[in-house]
Each structure stands twice: as structure tokens, then as C-alpha cells.
Amino acid sequence: MTKKTSHHKAEQKEKRAGEESGRESEVLDHKIEELENELIGAREQADKLREELLRKAAEFENFRRQKEREALMAGSRTLETVIRELLPFVDDVVRIVEHAPELLEKTEDARPYVDGAELLKKNLVRWLEDKGVTRIDALGKKMDVNLHEAITQVEYPDVEPETVVEVFQDGYVLGDRVLRHTKVVVAK
């Protein structure tokens, strides 16, 4: 082979190598571009998933808080129901204690029963207070339809009209909720 031919072959070989290198470079550039696009897509997908995860976490937290509130409200309603059902018994014990002096005047044998009734009243009142229940103080106050139920009106010349002059039955509140209105007699 001649120098020219071998040089020509070498040039062709170089040219082919350059073309192949160029094609490889093109292929690599194309592959890099594909990978960059995939990366961009993956990042966008990750951002969407992150946002959705944050949204779901917030929804779950709101759901948890709502269930806590509902549980508290259910417990509160149950407590209110129990207390409302207990109030007539409280009234009975209070009446027994109020009439105890009359009973003791008749017979000292009633002393253990009176002492028991007083202890029962004390424990009932303490239990109600521990639960947040308070008796509505009505005597001498202005009639308030939110707290009082007037059962009658009576002439009291020395008392301002609409003033509670007698409590017929005690009323109670639990926090800001009226469990039972105080039944009252009001001055005309």
C-alpha cells in the first residue's frame, strides 16, 4: 500500500471515528436531555405528592380535632343528662334537711336520719360543684327569663316590680348552660 492510500484510509477512519463520535455525542446529548426531562418530571411529581401529603396531614389534623370536640360534647351532654335526672333527688334531700328541725322537735330519735340527710346533701352539693354546677342565686334579683321561670306575681308594695321575692324551686347552671330554670315568685 502506498502512503497515500494508507493516509487516505487513516483519514477515512478518523472521519468515521469523528462521525461515530459525533453520533455518540448526539446520542449522549439526547440521552442527557431525556434524563433532564425525566428529572424535571420527577421533581414536579414529588412536589405534587408533597403538596398532597401536606393537605392530607392538615385534613387529618382537622378530623382529629373535630372528633375530640365531638367526644367532649358527647361527654358534656351525658353529664348534663345525669345531672338533670339527679336534680329532683337533690331537691328532696334539701327539703328533708330544711324540715329536719321540726322533726327533731318532735323526737330526738330522728337525729341519725337528720345527720344522714345533712351528710347526703353536703356530698351531693360537693359533687355538683366538682362537676361545675352552680345554683342560680335568684332571691332579691331582677327577673331574668334566661335564668328564672315566674310561676306567679304577687303585690309587694315595698319591692320594686319584677324582683324575685320567693324561690319555689332552685335552678342550676353548668358553665354557661342552664340545666334548670329557677321557679320564682315575682313582685308586681
UniProtKB/Swiss-Prot annotation:
Per its record, what are the GO molecular function terms? Answer: adenyl-nucleotide exchange factor activity; protein homodimerization activity; protein-folding chaperone binding; unfolded protein binding
Cited Gene3D superfamilies: 3.90.20.20, Head domain of nucleotide exchange factor GrpE
- Which keywords does this chain's UniProt record carry? Chaperone, Cytoplasm, Stress response
Taken from the UniProt record, the cysteine pairs bridged by disulfide bonds within this chain are: none
Residues in a coiled coil are none
From the UniProt entry, list the residue stretches annotated as the region Disordered. 1-30
Note the superkingdom of the native organism. Answer: Bacteria
Query: Where does the UniProt entry say this protein principally localizes?
Result: cytoplasm
Where do Basic and acidic residues bias regions lie? 8-30
- The signal peptide, as residue positions, is none
Q: Which GO terms describe its biological process?
A: protein folding
- What InterPro entries does this protein's entry cite? GrpE (IPR000740), GrpE_coiled_coil (IPR013805), GrpE_head (IPR009012)
Cellular component (GO) terms are:
cytoplasm
Localization per Swiss-Prot or TrEMBL: Cytoplasm
In the record, the note on similarity to other proteins reads: Belongs to the GrpE family.
Under the heading HAMAP family, the entry gives:
GrpE
The subunit structure is:
Homodimer.
Primary role: Participates actively in the response to hyperosmotic and heat shock by preventing the aggregation of stress-denatured proteins, in association with DnaK and GrpE. It is the nucleotide exchange factor for DnaK and may function as a thermosensor. Unfolded proteins bind initially to DnaJ; upon interaction with the DnaJ-bound protein, DnaK hydrolyzes its bound ATP, resulting in the formation of a stable complex. GrpE releases ADP from DnaK; ATP binding to DnaK triggers the release of the substrate protein, thus completing the reaction cycle.
| Name of the protein described by the UniProt record | Protein GrpE
According to its UniProt entry, this protein's organism is Chlorobium phaeobacteroides (strain BS1)
